[in-house]
Design a protein with these regions (language model features):
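Arg/Lys-rich, low-complexity, intrinsically disordered basic segments
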Residues: 1-62
Length: 62
């Protein structure tokens, strides 16, 4: 599955907001699949984009 597909799936299931979806689509081109997946998992649990990004960078890197 691609990064964009993962992001769209989370949005379609209403796990992330429209704003988070749009931001993640732009963000995906700069980061690895593992980074994006970690961010999506954290945002599904209620973390903000910025907090999820910091956690993903610390956890899996860029």
């Amino acid at each position: 599955m691609t990064k964009e597909t993962e992001i769209k799936k989370c949005y379609d299931m209403r796990k992330i907001t429209k704003r988070q979806h749009d931001t993640m689509m732009r963000h995906a081109s700069h980061h690895s699949f593992a980074h994006i997946r970690k961010m999506l998992d954290d945002m599904e649990k209620g973390m903000t984009f910025s907090a999820a990004h910091k956690a993903a960078t610390a956890s899996v890197g860029k």
